[in-house]
Amino acid sequence: MADSKPLRTLDGDPVAVEALLRDVFGIVVDEAIRKGTNASEKVCEWKEPEELKQLLDLELQSQGESRERILERCRAVIHYSVKTGHPRFFNQLFSGLDPHALAGRIITESLNTSQYTYEIAPVFVLMEEEVLKKLRALVGWNTGDGVFCPGGSISNMYAINLARFQRYPDCKQRGLRALPPLALFTSKECHYSITKGAAFLGLGTDSVRVVKADERGKMIPEDLERQISLAEAEGSVPFLVSATSGTTVLGAFDPLDAIADVCQRHGLWLHVDAAWGGSVLLSRTHRHLLDGIQRADSVAWNPHKLLAAGLQCSALLLRDTSNLLKRCHGSQASYLFQQDKFYNVALDTGDKVVQCGRRVDCLKLWLMWKAQGGQGLEWRIDQAFALTRYLVEEIKKREGFELVMEPEFVNVCFWFVPPSLRGKKESPDYSQRLSQVAPVLKERMVKKGTMMIGYQPHGTRANFFRMVVANPILVQADIDFLLGELERLGQDL
């Protein structure tokens, strides 16, 4: 039968290719979308690694398989994967499945182009420029530059590299030999990519000076001043401050205006890592959390997080208008960036980045924005804040739940205190025993498949849960389920 032929025979057979893809898309709609976003279905189907290897039959063979077997494999891959679009997936800073963004991702994959020249990606070169222009306008810049990067970590690393190049342009050719000992500054609550970036760029992790944060996780500008003076006294040259708008755990927003004042006094590049909190700029009600961001030199913003644009969608935005990106990263590869092309070669943006091939990440955001409009996206942000407030009030009502602190963003950090520990906060082993609760409950919920929520210690604080209210399809019933499920899972502890 034709259906039993190995998949390789589909080459050159458009009818068979179309039939296969229709079946695959049917599986995607049924399993990943319909079931994957249904609260009555499991978030995950947990299996131990060895069992999962056996179930998936991962080993690659010399012979191709039948169409039916390939479809079974597609179904299995989805079945055993975590459903991040599920309304009870609270584990990461991204969640949800926007249908228009997904449509954009499907088109992107189908066209399979690279965003480096206008000749092979004309639609997306123009589209990226327009999307970046809109994002910059929300930051508060009428002009500037930018690029989509493969994740917020890379955006942060770009900012470090650009700040270094601006101060010491000879480093592009001469490398570290052209540099004195450099110092960059960031809060102890920053994303770990800042330290990784310093190591990756050859500055070394010792070049990262950690600035104190207050009890809410916000950088203390006075300590930033102190750290700058200390670095200078030790013979280092300060060149960059990385502030955070929306820290990973507590959801804190650094005081950008005060930090910008410090940077202005010392002539330092100000980068704002708004990968998590940048989308708040869309909300007229809450954008005050990022007051002062327009004074930054660069901003990292991940629409794949709170806007649910889908992985990956990460923008690096620059206030610079001097073509700094291209001057820093360009290498003028003659087989790509010929200067005698028949169109305006300024549209060939590929020399701005350190990559050659670059994925198209603008379409999903553009299509979602076209469908929702700025007003629809603003509602999405405001709704997340409203549900956060609902969760906070419910936590305060329920026995056995305790807030770590009042949130200012959509990160809600709290403890579940099981029956055996209630009223025993003064016991010497209370914190140690409380720290054991979250890992046990996490294992139980994952193996049961009912929900996923992250936990972590923080400083001297015992392990606590970090609830992220980000999925646009969340409703109050999902919040109620979260709290009720923790009570059910922890009633015997």
UniProtKB/Swiss-Prot annotation:
Pathway: Organosulfur biosynthesis; taurine biosynthesis; hypotaurine from L-cysteine: step 2/2
Assigned keywords, A-Z: Decarboxylase, Lyase, Pyridoxal phosphate
Required co-factors: pyridoxal 5'-phosphate
InterPro entries referenced in this protein's UniProt entry, alphabetically: PyrdxlP-dep_de-COase, PyrdxlP-dep_Trfase, PyrdxlP-dep_Trfase_major, Pyridoxal-P_BS
Top-rank taxon: Eukaryota
EC number, as in UniProt: 4.1.1.29, 4.1.1.11
GO molecular-function term, one example from the UniProt record: sulfinoalanine decarboxylase activity
Record field: catalytic activity: L-aspartate + H(+) = beta-alanine + CO2; 3-sulfino-L-alanine + H(+) = hypotaurine + CO2; L-cysteate + H(+) = taurine + CO2
Gene Ontology terms: cellular component: cytoplasm; cytosol
Modification type N6-(pyridoxal phosphate)lysine: residues: 305
GO biological process: L-cysteine catabolic process to hypotaurine; L-cysteine catabolic process to taurine; taurine biosynthetic process
Tissue: Expressed in brain, liver and kidney.
Pfam hit, one: Pyridoxal_deC
Function text: Catalyzes the decarboxylation of L-aspartate, 3-sulfino-L-alanine (cysteine sulfinic acid), and L-cysteate to beta-alanine, hypotaurine and taurine, respectively. The preferred substrate is 3-sulfino-L-alanine. Does not exhibit any decarboxylation activity toward glutamate.
Family, per entry: Belongs to the group II decarboxylase family.
Subunit note: Homodimer.
Protein name in the entry: Cysteine sulfinic acid decarboxylase
UniProt source species: Rattus norvegicus
Taxonomic placement: Eukaryota, Metazoa, Chordata, Craniata, Vertebrata
